[in-house]
Amino acid sequence: MWSWFGGAAAQKRKEAPKNAILQLRSHLDMLQKREKHLENQMNEQEAIAKKNVTTNKNAAKAALRRKKVHEKNLEQTQAQIVQLEQQIYSIEAANINHETLAAMKAAGAAMEKIHNGMTVEQVDETILRDKLREQQAINDEIAIAITNPGFGEQVDEEDLEAELEGMEQEAMDERMLHTGTVPVADQLNRLPAPANAERKALPFPPQKRTPTDSLPAAKAKQKAEEEDEEAELEKLRAEMAM
């Protein structure tokens, strides 16, 4: 029975912050509705005063007095709203701190239970540590074997060069079969070494462009410009006719 009463008391203490927050929020909702009502009353009395300011000054003054009363009540209501909001924030922050502390205590107790009977010396003496060291050594040996230059079949650079020259010769022979002539560059490459070097040293004569090379392009450009001008004139004539 005593444990039941103790549990009920603990539950009541746990629910106390939530109940307080609910009560404060309910009262805050009521004050916010009152704030909206007072603002509407002020706007209504101001409209009455503006309506009677030139025709009935007494009615206008009475409306302004009522507006002042509503304005004072509105200020008090807004101050109460601020106080309630601060109290709600304070209770929520305190409740969050309490829950966080309880969670930290539970985590500490769980870690203490997990580490019960475990020490650094015991971990160092276990076979697990020896197995880890053995596997690490094997991994290092494998890495060294993979990165060793002797790992795998090495490629002979001379064989690659010879194969590449053979492919170039086949391509050149194929071009000769298709064209029936030997290209100038291939003839130079087939000359003996001294003659080939001498021919390579001689520059090719530069090609000269004759003035007639650019005549077709210039005529085409001039014709396009004339067509554009004619189209522009036709457009202007159509606009003037309208």
From Swiss-Prot:
Protein origin, superkingdom? Eukaryota
List the molecular function annotations (GO) for this entry.
identical protein binding
UniProt keywords (A-Z) are: Coiled coil, Cytoplasm, Endosome, Membrane
Query: Where in or outside the cell is it found?
Result: Cytoplasm; Endosome membrane
Q: Which GO terms describe its biological process?
A: ATP export; intralumenal vesicle formation; late endosome to vacuole transport via multivesicular body sorting pathway; peroxisome organization; protein transport to vacuole involved in ubiquitin-dependent protein catabolic process via the multivesicular body sorting pathway; reticulophagy; vesicle budding from membrane
* Stretches for region Disordered: 187-242
Function of this protein? Required for the sorting and concentration of proteins resulting in the entry of these proteins into the invaginating vesicles of the multivesicular body (MVB).
Q: Which family does it belong to?
A: Belongs to the SNF7 family.
Protein's UniProt name? Vacuolar-sorting protein snf7
